[in-house]
Each structure stands twice: as structure tokens, then as C-alpha cells.
Amino acid sequence: VMSAGNGNLSFYYCYEEGIAEKISTVPFSHSIVMPEYVVLLSADCENAVILQSDAVSYFKEQFFTVLQASLPLLNTVDTASLLSVFIQLSSETSRSYMLELQPCLTAFVDEEIIQNVINKSLPAAQQQLLTATLLRQCSNLKRISDFISVFSKRGLDDFVEKGIVYQVPLELYQPPCLQDRIKMLQRLIDANETGAKKFYMIKDTHFHPVFEIFTYNSSVLFSLTDSLASDASICILKENTIIDSFQAFLRHAVSHDLTYSIEETTSIFKEAVSRLKAQCDNI
């Protein structure tokens, strides 16, 4: 769905499947509503019909009906709100394949870790809300049985060396202490070794993800976070072909040597734990 006015162009995505299916069955499924006439286009854009001004009001009404079932195709949200988007999409899914800048660390926090890192200068109500949000997201992710995360080395290094968690705005927390980082990494190791989750680190020589992709049973989320982890540009689609394509891409990356194997990735996690334990011993 596209709307243009006053020199501005906006794109919307129709989330109401029934409306989309109804439109797709019409021979001329695309329409352009102008002030004085309406242009109807066939699905392949090879044929067109021009309707005169008496059709404008009818097609405007149809357009706004579709628009009411639509949301902006691209949206910018603060990172704290992005956690709520993740919760909404992951709450009823049994499958999640992810291309991430960092392994999915929010799946391995607990209330003790959250209380250790949360910014104590935040209002008490905000601290409680953030704690509840993170715990709910952790619960959702733990429940997902078919779970694959393909992530970058840079993101893992930032967590191990600096305690940075990309999915949480920097002003909301302080870096986890060495012991808490070890605890979270150990949970990553346990997930890989038991098969509860599957984490694969991307080989640096192959590709570097710039944005993140999160696929679920019936939706896919594209996310690009700014350098301060304060805002994210997001796009949510609910097209089965797109979901299937990106899940197939991630399976291809895993099976065609673009990533380290589960065993190799687990060894990398263990090496990181050893480095952190050595730092603890030197304190």
C-alpha cells in the first residue's frame, strides 16, 4: 500500500490476510487513485484500464479500508520498545531462525543477572517494567523448540570483552560482571550441547551481517539498530514465501560452511569462558 501527498511518499504493509487475498483475485489487482481518474493495473503490470472521475470516490473508500488494516512498512522505534515487538512476535511461535549481530543473549538472563546490571538511577517503575520485559522475552525464547541463531564474531567479542548486549539500550544497564558473563556463556554452551538451541558463528572471511533478521512461524522481522543501540529501524512482513526463503538461506549458510559448526561454535564459547575465568583469577 503506497500513499503520496504534499510531496511525501509513504509505504504501508497490509497485515489483514483476508483483504490481501481478496485483492489478489481481482484481474486488475493494482490501482492508482488520482484526483481526476483511477488507473487499474494487472498483477503483471502489462495491462491497464483508466477509469473516469466518477470512480474516484469508490476507489478512495476501498483504499482507506485497506489502509486501516495496514501499518507503516518501515518504522523506527527505540530499542526498549523493540523488546516489546520481539515479545509479540515470539509469544506464539514454535520456530525462530535468526541472523544476528550477536548471539541471542536475552534468552539466557535471569532475575539475578538483571538486578546486577540494571541502571539503578532509573525510576523504580521503569526498572520493574524492564525486568518484567526481559524475563518475559527470556521465557518466550526458552519455550521455542526449533531455534537457530547465526551470529557474528564481532558481537560475541563485544559481549565477552566489554559486556555489551546489543538488544538493550546502553543507558538502561551497566556491563555484566565477569561472573555473569561466564554464567550466560555457560548457558549458551549447555544449549548447544543439549540441542535445546543451535548457535552458529559466522566465519569472518565469508560475510558480515549489517542488519538482523528474525523469522518466526508466520512473520519475519528485519531490524537495523543504530551505533548507540538506542533506536532501531524495523520492517515486519507476514508473507510465507519470504519467511521460507530466509529460513532456507540460514539453513544454507549453516550447511555450506559459511559458519562454524555447532561443535566449533561451542568450543569458541568455551574458549571465551576460559579467558574470562583467567581474568577473574587475576583480580
Cite the ranges covered by each PLM segment.
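Hydrophobic protein-protein interaction segments
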Residues: V1-H252, L258
